[in-house]
Regions:
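Conserved N-terminal alpha-helix of the aminotransferase class I/II PLP-enzyme fold
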Residues: 2-47, 70-76
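Conserved PLP-anchoring active-site segment centered on the Schiff-base-forming lysine
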Residues: 53-69
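Active-site phosphate-binding strand-loop segment of PLP-dependent enzymes
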Residues: 93-153
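Conserved active-site segment immediately N-terminal to the catalytic lysine
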Residues: 160-172
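Active-site C-terminal subdomain of aminotransferase-like
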Residues: 172-262, 370
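Conserved PLP-binding catalytic core of the aspartate aminotransferase-like
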Residues: 269-304
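PLP-dependent enzyme catalytic core of the Aspartate aminotransferase-like
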Residues: 315, 319-370
């Protein structure tokens, strides 16, 4: 990223962009169009909405945390009618509940479903394949739109095979690039709906960005240094191999869960997500009993050890913390983080089972033999 800017109209920048758009197809696992935006995840949410919806369209939001709800709030501000299929911060979306709601919508009034594959507030992972299967089984024409900000590049995502219509992500998590880039992918079905969408705006518009001139790909000057960084990050991912990347995330997530499982024996802290199969491989949300103050633990880890834990969000705010294990991360980083948390629990006399970090080490030692 520490390099001079180059000509944005011809030469290496053009071929670089072409390579990125093609490699984003590999990441989303789609033959559909891919788009690069100078934006964060919230920006690319808006890109997705404005390219396929019109004012007054009805949107169904699948609740499993905070971020699909935020996406729905954005749709409401754009003039859409928003309905929330109520869920829980502690469990995944139930595909059968989605199907039941769509079966009640005989006139296909619901135009889009908004769902997060992983909600970073709750730590819930949703089974997008099962949700898509449930939707298609109803025969409903609704578009399935997926927030993959906290999942793409960390776990399987099969856009075409599963039947996802629109998917979005950002640069700063699994794609290992500083914040500032957003990405969208669109199925042929979504592109057909796009042609009659009433919320289209010049900057986000897919048709404009498919223009022949390189200028069109970014609707102006590209954020070149971020684009250079993305190229390097994708090269790292493909060198490691996507299957190996996914395995690394599974192992480090399970090591984290082994530690928390031991700490939970003290009955003061534990997992937010109740079902083990619904706990994500990119972030783990930890909740504490009501009388336990978690801020001193967060402060201790940051101020004494330089480890920044994610604060709890949404309905969990002030009630816990989050440990991320996604993107450019390895065993020493995770084990070090777990060790610091365990130190903090001991220093602050927060009841916990002893040996959580050791349990994580033991798990990894068996999972990754010599």
């Amino acid at each position: 990223m520490h390099r001079p800017a180059v000509d944005i109209y011809s030469g290496p920048m053009v071929s670089l962009t072409d390579s990125l758009l093609a490699d984003l197809q590999k990441m989303f696992r789609t033959k559909g169009g891919t788009y690069i935006y100078a934006a964060n995840g919230h920006g690319v949410w808006e890109a997705a909405l404005t390219n396929v919806l019109s004012r007054g369209d009805k949107v169904l939001v699948l609740e499993s945390g905070r971020f699909a709800i935020h996406w729905g709030e954005q749709a409401k501000m754009l003039g859409c009618e928003v309905e929330v299929l109520e869920g829980d911060f502690r469990c995944a979306v139930r595909p059968e509940a989605v199907a039941a709601r769509l079966k009640q919508d005989g006139k296909n009034a619901i135009k889009a479903i908004l769902v997060a594959q992983i909600d970073t507030a709750s730590g819930v992972v949703n089974d997008i394949e099962a949700v898509c299967e449930a939707v298609r089984a109803t025969g409903h024409e609704v578009l399935v739109m997926v927030d993959a900000v906290a999942s793409l590049g960390c776990m399987p995502f099969e856009m075409d095979a599963w039947g996802v219509d629109v998917a979005i992500t950002g640069s700063q998590k699994g794609l290992m690039t500083p914040p500032g880039l957003g990405f969208a992918a669109a199925s042929p079905r979504a592109r057909a709906v796009h042609n009659k969408a009433g919320l289209r705006t010049p900057y986000w518009d897919w048709t404009f960005r498919e223009g022949e001139a390189h200028y069109h790909k970014y609707c102006g000057t590209p954020p070149q240094q971020l684009v250079f960084g993305l190229r390097a990050a994708l090269d790292m991912i493909f060198t490691e191999g996507l299957d190996n990347v996914f395995r690394r995330h599974r192992l480090l997530a399970e090591a984290t869960r082994r530690a928390i499982g031991v700490w939970a024996e003290g009955q003061a802290i534990g997992f937010n997500v109740t079902e083990p199969a619904e706990r994500s491989d990119t972030v783990t949300a930890v909740v504490a009993r009501e009388e336990i103050r978690v801020q001193p633990l967060i402060d201790y880890c940051a101020n004494q050890c330089g480890v920044v834990l994610g604060r709890a969000l949404g309905t969990l705010e002030g009630k816990g913390f989050r440990i991320a294990h996604m993107g450019h991360i390895n065993a020493p980083m995770v084990i070090g983080t777990l060790g610091v948390v365990e130190m903090g629990l001991s220093v602050l006399n927060i009841p916990h089972g002893k040996g959580g970090t050791a349990a994580a080490i033991d798990y990894l030692a068996k999972a990754v033999p010599a």
